[in-house]
Design a protein with these regions (language model features):
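Catalytic center-proximal scaffold of phosphoryl-transfer enzymes
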Residues: 1-228
């Protein structure tokens, strides 16, 4: 069984009523709302025997804008659906495909036996941040990092990054590399599972589903939105 989770950032016209958006000290308005998407499915299959397109098996979607205790209630709704529709004693494994956001990790702690797998999009995003300054050697450097994540230790991974950091032409890229390194290290086992491609680990479709389910109406081709 698979649970996938991601989010979209929606720009609001107002929060509760027109004119209530405020600016902070950096002159940015508080008009961003995080919309959460979680969906449960049983795997991936071809749309037809000869098709190159694939589809999720029995997907069920949940959307919300919850925070704090409401986030707990949001995840409870997800797990209530799972408990009501599946005999968990017969489910061999539940995989969580996600980017490791705090609201997602808090949800994972609410059910036993979840195996967290980092999605490909975010692995590649942060590998690019670590290697973008390598230019023509970028892909070779990324391959070396993938190999370290897949089958070596955190120490091996950090030694490669130290070497890559030494190739920076100036100090402007240091924070980029530091942040990307910290992200992968904080999701280390989840990244390993993704890159090892073991049985049961399926490709994540979160970015595509966020685009189709949320972004098409809320951010990339938006309508007008408020909280109320």
């Amino acid at each position: 069984l698979y649970i996938e989770a991601d989010e979209d950032h929606v720009s609001l016209q107002f929060r509760d009523k027109k004119g209530d958006l405020e600016e902070n000290e950096n002159h940015r308005k508080n008009n961003c709302l995080i919309t959460k998407l979680v969906y449960v499915h049983e795997g991936i299959e071809k749309e037809s025997p000869k098709s190159e397109r694939h589809r999720l098996i029995n997907p069920y979607y949940f959307c919300g804008t919850s925070y704090g205790e409401e986030n707990t209630a949001f995840w409870d709704e997800v797990y209530e659906y799972i408990n009501n529709h599946y005999d968990l004693d017969k489910v061999k494994k539940i995989y969580m495909n996600a980017d490791g956001g705090a609201w997602i990790k808090s949800g994972m702690r609410r059910i036993a036996g979840i195996t967290y797998v980092l999605d490909e999009f975010h692995i590649e995003k942060y590998l690019t941040k670590l290697t973008s300054h390598m230019k023509d050697s970028r892909e070779d450097a990324a391959d070396e990092l993938r190999a370290a994540i897949r089958s070596k230790t955190k120490k091996d991974f950090e030694e490669i990054i130290d070497r890559l950091e030494g190739c920076l032409e100036n100090e402007t890229g240091q924070k980029r590399i530091s942040d990307a390194k910290e992200y992968i290290l904080s999701n280390w086992m989840a990244a390993k599972l993704r890159l090892r491609h073991q049985d049961g680990v399926k490709g994540s479709s979160t970015e595509g589903h966020v685009s189709h389910v949320l972004s098409s109406r809320m951010s990339s081709r938006p309508m007008g939105w408020s909280i109320t």
